[in-house]
Amino acid sequence: LDIAYFGESPAFDALLAMLGESPAADFGPLPADTLAAASFTLAAPGDAENGELLAGLDMLAAPASFINDILPKLGGPSVVFMGEADGENELEIPVFGMALRMDDDTVASELNAMMDKTMLLANLATLQWETDPIRFNRGDYQGHGYRIAEIGAPLAQHTGWPEFKAMQVVYGRVGDYFFVCTGEHFFHQCIDAHRGEAPLRVRFDGPVHERATTPIMSIAMKPEGLADMMRTWRAVLGDEGLELDLSLDVPMIQTELGQNIELLDPFDAMTMQLWRGEDGLVVGRIQLTAPE
């Protein structure tokens, strides 16, 4: 399935402007239980039309500068991924992660400081919520040290959802990567994948679009696993809780995932790649694979 973006969406245009050239299919050491992943490279503000996100990261990096001190030490691409983990009441909860490849490993200390500051700011929110504070611990797995922010208890108290109790923010350096995950088990899988001890369950293998010039993002999914997770949460939240507006200021592009879960079932793999094509046009290719 080939796609092309001709719309005029400020939100989508701002997102696309922040994406630089990215290796076509480089996902790095993904956790074994990954259900979806996206690989991309952030463009420097001088090359992007909108540097607001990077300016916000600059604030978290102070007194260092994310744009001038940290970003130049990162190698592309960055990867975000999601999977699922055991939660309360035997309910599988979504877990998320991010991997930043480092060209200069001295940047790990600056990234740790950014995450520490982010968690400190998050802890201030618990004062307004009048909940337990976020508690901090350290962990070690296979010789890799990392930091843990126990965000689950205050989130569960604030929302009334005990399923959130298992949520954590776990972060640290693993080789040439800096990982951030919302679960310690997921972080351990990142370490296992980096050591080559866990199989990569999501693979990307898609043809290049004939109008492509610059690859900007690659996405890989396990549709069946995502469908199972959404069915579980539809039973908990109801259909309205899974409605997702994907319009991005383009009203013709809308869907309600809660009503269309079954569309994912026939496929065991889905990949998508986006490129900048002729005259800046964004083109893409989606490839769906059914079991043999």
Which residues does each predicted region cover?
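Signature of soluble extracytoplasmic/periplasmic domains of secreted precursors
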Residues: 1-292
